[in-house]
Amino acid sequence: MSRMTAVRTPAPSDRPRLGLRERKKIKTREAIRTATYGLIEEQGYEATTVEQIADRAEVSASTVFRYFPAKEDIVLTDEYDALLVEDLRSRPADEPWLESLRHAMRRAVGLGMGEEQEVTRLRCRLMAEVPAVRSRMLENMSETGRAIGEAIGERTGRDPESLEVRVFTMSLVGGLMEVSQYWARTGFRDDLSDLVDRALTVFARGLTS
């Protein structure tokens, strides 16, 4: 694997400029993530400690934990969930729901592969190979599903906490997690956007030929 480049937080150009305090927080967060990915690349996930991450990022260990409650969160946390939900809410009201979802997912994947391709692959590989990372991802799925469910509720007029919406969103999030692991286990040979499209087609049509 080539040396990791610095992790960048995607920021739409139409958003107002952040204040100095917020920019410093983002810079610290990115420094911690970049340090983590670099250390994992060099010595592996299990050998990488929070103390080493803090030292390389030039912050204290307590600062690392203030931004990320656990080491697994450093690997898993990104800004694409929020962008995905934002995209879903901005799609035309008369557009079929799955088409809106397909569009938003393509954009999220495109941003991840365009700006953080190495990081995206490493994250997926760790989810497939490291039980602690995979377990933490499962814990985080409910929060992601709830955010998507709220967007679905706005579009459909359904209660986001209804059984039907929860089943749909958690099935979707679980399916996308499986896409990530499948991609890693097959050596990243397929285009990730194509795999996401295939998964969404299963949601639309079921296991039909």
Per-region residue spans from a language model:
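C-terminal peripheral helix-coil segments that are non-catalytic and often amphipathic
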Residues: 1-12, 188-209
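Basic, helix-initiating cap at the start of DNA-binding domains
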Residues: 2-43, 47-62, 83
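Short amphipathic alpha-helical segment with a characteristic S/N-K-E followed by hydrophobic residues
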Residues: 32, 70-75
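Short secondary-structure transition hinges
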Residues: 82, 118-146, 158
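Hydrophobic alpha-helical connector segments
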Residues: 86-123
